[in-house]
Swiss-Prot record:
Keywords for this protein: Amidation, Antibiotic, Antimicrobial, Defensin, Disulfide bond, Signal
Assembly description: Forms dimers and higher-order oligomers.
Coiled coil location: none
Keyword Disulfide bond on entry: yes
Residues with PTM Tyrosine amide: Y65
Signal peptide (residue range): 1-22
Disulfide bonds: C32-C54, C39-C61, C44-C60
Entry protein name: Panusin
Family: Belongs to the beta-defensin family.
Originating species: Panulirus argus
Function comment: Antimicrobial peptide. Has antibacterial activity against Gram-positive bacteria S.aureus ATCC 29737 and B.subtilis ATCC 6633 as well as against Gram-negative bacteria E.coli ATCC 10536 and K.pneumoniae ATCC 10031.
Domain of life of the native organism: Eukaryota
GO terms under biological process: defense response to bacterium
């Protein structure tokens, strides 16, 4: 019975570690750089703005701009 409890505990720790780790750094599906843009901290004209993820609250802009 004790062995079963130890195995269950180990399994629980493994599952918890996996959940805490979560997915790898922001999913690159919606990443700005991977989709032909670059993250800018300055103003980006509305026509050049892309709706992709940028860290630190930056705006995703088309690479052709600036």
């Amino acid at each position: 019975m004790k062995t079963k409890a130890v195995l269950m505990l180990m399994l629980l720790v493994l599952v918890a570690a996996t959940l805490v780790q979560g997915e790898p750094e922001p999913s690159y599906v919606g990443d700005c750089g991977s989709n032909g843009g670059s993250c800018v901290s300055s103003y980006c004209p509305y026509g050049n703005r892309l709706n992709y993820f940028c860290p630190l609250g930056r705006t995703c802009c088309r690479r052709s701009y600036g």
